[in-house]
Structures are given as C-alpha cells and as structure tokens.
C-alpha cells in the first residue's frame, strides 16, 4: 500500500514512517516543517513540503500519488500555548482536518488513522480511562482534537470515510538505533527536558505543581514508547484495510508514573543528579491520565514492547547523548 503520513517529519510521525517502511509499505510524507525536521524523514519516503490547510497542495500530491490510506499527525499540540491562543489550534488542527477530509473525499481516499489525544477526556472521573468515558476537554488543544473526531464521524456517515482515532497519552523514547528521536522547539515534554538537563544542554528542571491529589503531589501520566505507538498506527491501518468499522482506541501502557518518579528513573538511567525545582500548576493540566488499552489489545492485537519506564528513558537518553543539539537544524 501507499500510505501518506501527514506530519511525517515530526516526532511520532518520523518514527511511524520508519516502521511503515520496515513493514514493506510505500510511504509519502507531507509536512510544512513548522515544527518538523526534514532530517528526521527517512530518505526512502517521498517528501512533499506544504500545509494540510492548503487544498491546492493536497490536490497536487493526491493527483501525483495513488494514496491507499492516510496517517494524520499534522497538528499543534502544546497545551499552555492552546490556552493562550485557542484560535491558532482550531484553525490548524480542526480546520486542517476539514480541508483534508474534503481532499480525501474528492480523490476517493477512504481510510485515515488519526492522532487524537487523552486530552479529549479532560479531568477523568475514573482511572484507567476507557474509550466510552465522557470526553470533556479542559483545554483548547483537547477540544480541537475532539472536534476533529466528531467531524470524522459525520464524514464517515455521509461519505463512508473510515477512520481510527488513536487517543494516546505521554509519548517518550526514541528509535532504539538512535537514528531519530525527540527534538521540539521549544521543548515542553518532561522526559526530553530532564535528559537535556542531564546532558548539560539545559540549566534546570521545573516541575509544575506538587499539590495534585496524587501519591507524591505531582502529575501522574501514562507513558508509551514512540515505536510502540508507531506500531499501533500500522495495526490500525490493517484494521481498516480488513473492512472494519470506524472506531477509537486508547494507546497507553496502563501504568501511571508521577513526574517525580520519571525524574528519579532518569537519574538512575543517566547517573546524573539532575537538579529540579517545584513551580506552580500549569493551566489546563489534569492531575492523572492513565489509559485502559484493553480494547486496542483485544481488537488490534496491540501490545507494547516497552512497558518499563527505565527502558523507555534508556532509548531517549541514547538519542540525547549522541545528538545534544537534536537534528541541529534550528537556530
């Protein structure tokens, strides 16, 4: 199959491109490189630079390539930024989805696996979170992704565009061979921030909030390795290719780790002291997000290979140690 990966120069997208290629698929990457890295794209994939909000761009690519399915990562994803500039998120994320679905419908592309988020659940009433639990986002990022899910549902009803929405939690780690990894500007994810401090490329770590109703007062999150997540997207494509109905799946390890536990695991893996200070809570951050991934395990046959936080951090540390400047393409 020829699979178009939108946002394929980004962190999760670039790992998914590699896994798709390893599975023998033909891969096309579309990315505007606002946050992605050209160097992260496997040279075996055909690359097109452009924006998913640009219908003319999508039409050109879909005319040139015979696309069998789409994996869609192209979105802004920083919660605090979404609180300050919600329209940016609705324009890019939700608006981009509308343009994409219009192009898919025009060119007869009937399958899409979409990167949703645990942020659609908001502050959960129970943990672990199930797919049937209420979706009440506490920030515009989560709201923009929930709107995307709803738009896809009605596009399925009207046009028969089949989708899988993968709702995932905190993603971490890097390709085990160290070829690609996480490199955001600015970096907002706790694992790379901690490892940048360990590597000496960042001066200190601030943990946001130590008064949450958790075991040590810091946020608790479910961590999934980026390669396990990439594999989930491939399984979701196979699920759609088999003619199954549209659905949503949680992808997570089902284990919660607090920010302090992540810090201590990183200290153990790196052998560095990694100084940290406590700061106030960030707006829009739920206290605990842990996934029930039973549905993905039962229906997709998904099983994480990296369910140990030390192993996840080891792969991330291998990337950061060998690439202290990331891809080295940002001034």
From Swiss-Prot:
Its EC number is 5.1.3.2. NAD(+) binds at residues 11-12, 31-36, 51-52, 73-77, 92, 117, 141, 145, 169. Coiled coil: none annotated. One of its GO terms (molecular function) is UDP-glucose 4-epimerase activity. It catalyses: UDP-alpha-D-glucose = UDP-alpha-D-galactose. Its cofactor is NAD(+). One of its GO terms (biological process) is galactose catabolic process via UDP-galactose, Leloir pathway. Keywords: Carbohydrate metabolism, Galactose metabolism, Isomerase, NAD. Pathway: Carbohydrate metabolism; galactose metabolism. NCBIfam families: galE (TIGR01179). Belongs to the NAD(P)-dependent epimerase/dehydratase family. Homodimer. This is UDP-glucose 4-epimerase. It comes from Lacticaseibacillus casei. The gene is galE.
């Amino acid at each position: 199959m020829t699979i178009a990966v939108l946002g394929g120069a980004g962190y999760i997208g670039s790992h998914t491109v590699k896994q798709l290629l390893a599975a023998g698929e033909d891969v096309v990457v579309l990315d505007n490189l606002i946050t992605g890295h050209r160097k992260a794209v496997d040279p075996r994939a055909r690359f097109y630079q452009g924006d998913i909000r640009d219908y003319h761009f999508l039409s050109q690519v879909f005319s040139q390539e015979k696309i069998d399915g789409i994996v869609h990562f192209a979105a802004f994803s920083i919660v605090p930024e979404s609180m300050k500039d919600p329209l940016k998120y609705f324009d890019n994320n939700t608006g981009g989805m509308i343009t994409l679905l219009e192009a898919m419908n025009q060119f007869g592309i009937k399958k899409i696996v979409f990167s949703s988020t645990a942020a659609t659940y908001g502050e959960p009433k129970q943990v672990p979170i199930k797919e049937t639990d209420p979706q009440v986002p506490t920030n515009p990022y989560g709201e923009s992704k929930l709107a995307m899910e709803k738009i896809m549902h009605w596009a399925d009803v009207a046009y028969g565009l089949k989708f899988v929405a993968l709702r995932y939690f905190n993603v971490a780690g890097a390709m085990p061979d160290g070829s690609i990894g996480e490199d955001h500007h600015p970096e907002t994810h706790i694992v790379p921030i901690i490892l940048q401090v360990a590597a000496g490329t960042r001066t200190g770590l601030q943990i946001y909030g130590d008064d949450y109703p958790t075991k040590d007062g810091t946020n608790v999150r479910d961590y999934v390795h980026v390669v396990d997540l990439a594999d989930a997207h491939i399984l979701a494509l196979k699920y759609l290719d088999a003619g199954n109905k549209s659905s949503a799946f949680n992808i997570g390890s089902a284990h919660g780790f607090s920010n302090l536990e992540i810090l201590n695991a990183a200290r153990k893996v790196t052998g560095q002291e990694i100084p940290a200070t406590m700061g106030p809570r960030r707006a829009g951050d739920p206290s605990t997000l842990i996934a029930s991934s039973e549905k993905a395990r039962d229906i997709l046959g998904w099983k994480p290979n990296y369910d140990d936080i030390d192993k996840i951090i080891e792969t991330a540390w291998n990337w950061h140690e060998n690439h202290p400047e990331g891809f080295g393409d940002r001034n």
